[in-house]
Curated annotation (Swiss-Prot):
This is Abhydrolase domain-containing protein AFT2-1. Disulfide bonds: none annotated. Pathway: Mycotoxin biosynthesis. Abhydrolase domain-containing protein; part of the gene clusters that mediate the biosynthesis of the host-selective toxins (HSTs) AF-toxins responsible for Alternaria black spot of strawberry disease by the strawberry pathotype. AF-toxin I and III are valine derivatives of 2,3-dyhydroxy-isovaleric acid and 2-hydroxy-isovaleric acid respectively, while AF II is an isoleucine derivative of 2-hydroxy-valeric acid. These derivatives are bound to a 9,10-epoxy-8-hydroxy-9-methyl-decatrienoic acid (EDA) moiety. Belongs to the AB hydrolase superfamily. AKT2 hydrolase family. InterPro entries: AB_hydrolase_1, AB_hydrolase_fold. The gene is AFT2-1. Gene3D superfamilies: alpha/beta hydrolase. SUPFAM superfamilies: alpha/beta-Hydrolases (SSF53474). It is found in: Peroxisome. One of its GO terms (molecular function) is hydrolase activity. A motif (Peroxisomal targeting signal type 1) lies at residues 260-262. Gene clusters encoding host-selective toxins (HSTs) are localized on conditionally dispensable chromosomes (CDCs), also called supernumerary chromosomes, where they are present in multiple copies. The CDCs are not essential for saprophytic growth but controls host-selective pathogenicity.
Amino acid sequence: MQQPIVGVGHSMGGCQIATLSVTSRRMFSTMILLDPAIGPLDMGLATLGLGQLTLRRRTQWPTREDAEKALRTSFSTWDPQVLDLLIRHSIHSDKQSIEMEDGPVSLVTGRYQELVNYIKPSFIRSGKVNGQELVHQTGPVDMYHMLGLVTCSALYLCGGESTLSVPRARDLWLSRTAKLSYSKEPGETRKVDERVVPDTGHFLPMEEPKECADIIADWIEKDECIAWNCCLGKRGKTWRELSNASKEMGAEAWMEYLQSKL
């Protein structure tokens, strides 16, 4: 794939982007993780009560107007344009009300689809819906232990009032990310930093989309694109422009040099 590629993800999406940066090494030139769900076991999904919140969430309303009123109340801190998009795309008419002018509506994404992000659906294998051990998804904890294997620079973009990216979590992210030096190329540096958007919670990209976009654009333009164009991109382009004969000569010279080092 054509580089540079930038990975951007929020919450569980941030965890998935970070995981992809490890499992598909060198895919990303940099990644921006917005309030990512990444942490040790004592800060994992089991401690957040997300499964209980999901099961209690209302998913149906008598009319579209009722649904819109409920969503605007629940997400009142969101940017108005973002909230309009949520309402436009997150609810749909129930089958029995399609022909009606205004009938019952439901969330497009049901509780089950959200719940399996947090708790493993053990009933699928066992065939039993009760009596099974409650097992939370381990992705966020797994990724926490893999942070040292990250092979690109990273920006953690956090909500100032978020219960997920608390100071301890941010300190752990910064201290562990991309710290294993064995996978670096000669002269390669990996920048790891954080930015905090004040007065926002876990939904910071929905609450302050412009500020988040400005921070992301600044990170990409001033830091990563300059670094890419000056270093990795330039070096790779120079190699690609060489003839096959020149590449072979370069490879032979390199192997001859290695004989005195190995």
